[in-house]
Amino acid sequence: MTTALHEERLAAVLAAVAETGARNVLDLGCGAGDLVLRLAERPDIERITGIEIDAARLRLAEARLKDLPEAACARVQLACASLTQAHPVLAGYDCACLVEVIEHLPPADINRLERAVFATMRPAHVIVTTPNAEYNPVLGVPAHRMRHPGHQFEWDRPRFARWAGGVAARTGYAVACRDICGAHPDLGGASQMALFSRSGR
């Protein structure tokens, strides 16, 4: 079961995927398959690959796929692998999604993730979402805590924009950041999204 906030986040990601016109999509850090299942329900998406390092969560995703029609399942592949290691076999996708993933990585792994995704896989588009730390008071999160015990960090919007801009400049992508999951006039949304598009496609 997903929360209303997570459903809103997934809807924003699906809308962004539609913006790109992607026909094949990578879900990097797919977890139990929340996004994969929703992508599989869309006939315009021809191929979906989910990557997850947690074998138990991947098994759950596999089990959930069995509830889909056979034609939808046939368009999905799942694999257990690290997101911070380069996988040339995953090159050539139209779009890669990292939904609330980067905040679970130790800071030292962020650069490895950048190299793996933006230098090796180099999808035409990359969609990244992460919590907006500025919004935490609205959710009742104390100032000295993060939203989830597994989070290594939570960035405010300026920090996220700096990271996204740096990645784009280093790897030949353009990027646009936006608020998602709410629009507080001062604090933005509960989550934030960066949509990267490879330059010179």
Per-segment meaning from a language model:
Residues T3-H6, A12, D34-L35, I53-L98, ...:
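S-adenosyl-L-methionine-dependent methyltransferase catalytic module, highlighting the catalytic core
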Residues L5-R23:
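Conserved alpha-helix/loop element of class I SAM-dependent methyltransferases that forms part
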Residues A22-G31:
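Conserved class I S-adenosyl-L-methionine
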Residues R23, E46, A124:
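Short acidic/polar active-site loop segments enriched in Thr and Asp
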Residues A32-D44:
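Conserved SAM-binding loop of SAM-dependent methyltransferases across substrates and taxa
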Residues R47-E52:
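Conserved SAM-binding motif I beta-strand of class I
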